[in-house]
Amino acid sequence: MIRLGKLTDYGLVLMSQIAKRDASELHTARDLAAGCQLPLPTVSKLLKVLLHQGLLASHRGTKGGYSLAREPHLISLAEIIAAMEGPLALTECSLESGSLCDLEASCAIRDNQRIINQVVRGALESVMLSDLIRPLQLIAIRDAKGNVVTTTSTASGRMQ
């Protein structure tokens, strides 16, 4: 089963919490912990990772806190997941930096694995943080061959 780690899930919740509020508002770790109903040490750890990965900005001072480094519509789900988990790859041979797989030379499905990885990555890159804070609707449509294809539509009507 492909599953995001718990900290990645919490990172998505945290980023969504920040994105829901006014862009000029700064958020303290304590306020975010309360808003997300997560332990303060967990939120502090998440903030450190997301800040280090360039998704958050830190503002010092008595009225300091954290804000998004970019507008929510410019931060993809893929970026957040990669910040928390590392490079997006379903298998070792899907890593862009090279494979650690012992079967690489004889693998019959390596090329297909890479294509599947690209499709999954593309789907995650198409969902933006701004989409996470609005309800998504699953829509079934037919392609040119008549096959049912599912897609999503945001509350604003943008198809993905």
Residue ranges with predicted function:
Residues 2-6, 12-38, 57, 67:
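N-terminal helix-turn-helix DNA-binding core of bacterial DNA-binding proteins
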Residues 34, 51-52:
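Alpha-helical residues within the helix-turn-helix
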Residues 41:
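Key DNA-contact positions within bacterial/archaeal DNA-binding proteins
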Residues 53-69:
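Beta-hairpin "wing" of winged helix-turn-helix
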Residues 72-97, 109-119:
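Conserved segment of winged-helix/HTH DNA-binding domains
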Residues 95-160:
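C-terminal regulatory/oligomerization modules of transcriptional regulators
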